[in-house]
Design a protein with these regions (language model features):
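Helix-coil boundary and interhelical linker segments in multi-pass alpha-helical membrane proteins
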Residues: 1-6, 48-72, 113-134
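Membrane-embedded helix-turn/re-entrant segments that form the catalytic/gating core
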Residues: 61-69, 73-95
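Membrane-embedded alpha-helical segments that form the functional core of polytopic membrane enzymes
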Residues: 1-34, 69-78, 138
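Alpha-helical transmembrane segments
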Residues: 3-4, 38, 42, 69-76, ...
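C-terminal membrane-associated helical module and adjoining short loops/tails
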Residues: 98-175
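Interhelical loop and helix-boundary elements at the membrane-water interface
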Residues: 23-41, 85-105, 151-166
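Alpha-helical transmembrane segments and their lipid-water interface positions
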Residues: 18-22, 43-50
Length: 175
């Protein structure tokens, strides 16, 4: 799972900088936007859904194994991510801010869970993360936040000027 997290973080890193570079070089195209969203769909849509699928499989009580349907609930994040990315592509309101949680932010939250399981030694944390109700709740919350009508700051730098990007720099420093 650590390699999954590594490659997802690498994909998110390149996703951030390819858009920045395209804007800086003024080479943005409609095809580029679609290809960017397709790459986002894999790194920030399919992967978190599969991670939740895996965690829900681990968390399923033995009595639920007969149906085996609970893990599939995690794939709702993939569908919500696809809807969010499609909505982003056609929206004219998201050039300076995001409406709803960006898919990479949601992905970073979800891929942190298996890493916590692997690298911490707290039985309480393991119990919480592998609680099926926690994972179902997280899935529902993620699906909602991805498409919530809430404006969030975007880390889209048009210039490196501190004055116009003070909020962005502050967010990065505080993170």
């Amino acid at each position: 799972m650590k390699w999954t997290a590594f490659f997802v973080c690498l994909g998110i890193f390149f996703d951030f900088f390819d858009g920045l570079l395209a804007r800086k070089l003024n080479v943005q195209t409609a095809l580029g936007l679609q290809l960017d969203s397709l790459a986002d769909m894999v790194t920030s849509g399919v992967v978190p859904g599969l991670v939740l699928f895996h965690l829900l499989g681990l968390a399923s009580p033995p009595s639920w194994e007969t149906t085996g349907l609970l893990p599939y609930f995690g794939l709702l994040v993939t569908l919500a991510s696809a809807y969010r990315l499609a909505n982003f592509n056609v929206s004219t309101e998201q050039s300076d801010a995001f409406i709803g949680l960006p898919t990479p932010a949601n992905t970073l939250l979800i891929i942190s869970l298996p890493l916590l399981l692997e690298y911490q030694n707290s039985a309480a944390v393991t119990t919480i993360i592998l609680n099926p109700w926690f994972l179902v709740g997280l899935t529902v919350l993620s699906c909602y936040l991805l498409n919530a009508p809430v404006k969030l700051i975007a880390l889209k730098f048009k210039t490196w000027d501190f004055k116009t990007n003070a909020n962005r720099y502050l967010l990065i420093i505080l993170s």
